[in-house]
């Protein structure tokens, strides 16, 4: 027999929803700080553009998760079916965008390590900006088409073929992102830690590797669930509710963890009392091995207004 609180709220549902709200609030603050610093206070480079867009996607996803969990706990229904559909579509857009940004970051980092000369000399200047714009537009189109064929038209007449096609395309796109992310991550690890030509590890490499590790541990299970849901939607009703709630909590942790990773890596071996948040984030995105000259430069930046 399930334990309930007054108002018939199941404890097994209440605790995960509260965890989502708590992790969401922490993640909102962290991603907002990252977005604010990268957007207005730090000079942008190829990777910081991706990090900025990833922070925006995580911020919007956590905000949507908090709203959905709060409405569920308060037993407040959505204003209308259209609002519910738009809300779910936006949540899906920012979620897929976040995965796409991670894949793009991993690929760019892999290219910069495997082909450093080509990357420095021949990479188009505005590649990051163009890629981020393409990712946002593509994610938006995929989710709008999926919602249109599987929600709007499906309620009016039999539209199973079109819905199935969009589900297969969406699942295939997510599988493609996972394959790219995993292969580029393995190549990056091999280049950094294996073979005769090992490269010196930078703080940025540590930041990216930790971010990818957290995603594989906390974000990947929900991605696999989404892929299965898109491919066998009509027959995928056997998943335990508690397991699904655990996946939601892990996804919230994944979106919340990135800013914590940035500030942890940036402050490692540094005295926190002598550092600002701007300096910590700048240090986490440092793409050159630490030398005495780098430390002197960081100290001089501290003295700047």
Swiss-Prot record:
Residues 39-53, 100-132, 189-207, 266-305 are cytoplasmic. GO terms for molecular function: G protein-coupled receptor activity. The gene is Mrgpra2b. One of its GO terms (cellular component) is plasma membrane. Residues 1-17, 75-78, 154-167, 229-244 are extracellular. Orphan receptor. May be a receptor for RFamide-family neuropeptides such as NPFF and NPAF, which are analgesic in vivo. May regulate nociceptor function and/or development, including the sensation or modulation of pain. The keyword Ligase does not apply. Belongs to the G-protein coupled receptor 1 family. Mas subfamily. This is Mas-related G-protein coupled receptor member A2B. It is a multi-pass membrane protein. Expressed in a subset of sensory neurons that includes nociceptors. Expressed in the subclass of non-peptidergic sensory neurons that are IB4(+) and VR1(-).
């Amino acid at each position: 027999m399930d334990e309930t609180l007054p108002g018939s709220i199941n404890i097994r549902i209440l605790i995960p929803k509260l965890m989502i709200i708590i992790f969401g609030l922490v993640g909102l603050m962290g991603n907002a700080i990252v977005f604010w610093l990268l957007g207005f206070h730090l000079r942008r480079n190829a990777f910081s553009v991706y990090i900025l867009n990833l922070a925006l996607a995580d911020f919007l996803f956590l905000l949507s998760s908090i709203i959905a969990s709060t409405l569920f706990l308060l037993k407040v229904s959505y204003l209308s079916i259209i609002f519910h559909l738009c809300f779910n579509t936006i949540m899906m857009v920012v979620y897929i965008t976040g995965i796409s940004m991670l894949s793009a970051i991993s690929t760019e980092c892999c290219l910069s390590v495997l082909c450093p000369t080509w990357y420095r000399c021949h990479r188009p200047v505005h590649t990051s900006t163009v890629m981020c714009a393409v990712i946002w537009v593509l994610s938006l189109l995929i989710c709008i088409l999926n919602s249109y064929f599987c929600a709007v038209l499906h309620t009016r007449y039999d539209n199973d073929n079109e819905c199935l096609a969009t589900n297969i395309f969406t699942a295939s796109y997510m599988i493609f992102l996972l394959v790219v992310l995993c292969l580029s991550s393995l190549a990056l690890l091999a280049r950094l830690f294996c073979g005769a030509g090992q490269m010196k590890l930078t703080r940025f490499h540590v930041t990216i590797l930790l971010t990818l590790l957290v995603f594989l541990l906390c974000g990947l299970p929900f991605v696999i669930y989404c892929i299965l849901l898109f491919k066998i939607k009509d027959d995928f009703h056997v998943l335990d509710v508690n397991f699904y709630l655990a996946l939601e909590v892990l996804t919230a942790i994944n979106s919340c963890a990135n800013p914590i990773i940035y500030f942890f890596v940036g402050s490692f071996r540094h005295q926190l009392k002598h550092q600002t948040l701007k300096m910590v984030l700048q240090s986490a995105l440092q793409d050159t091995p630490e030398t005495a000259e780098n430390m002197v430069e960081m100290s001089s930046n501290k003295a700047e207004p």
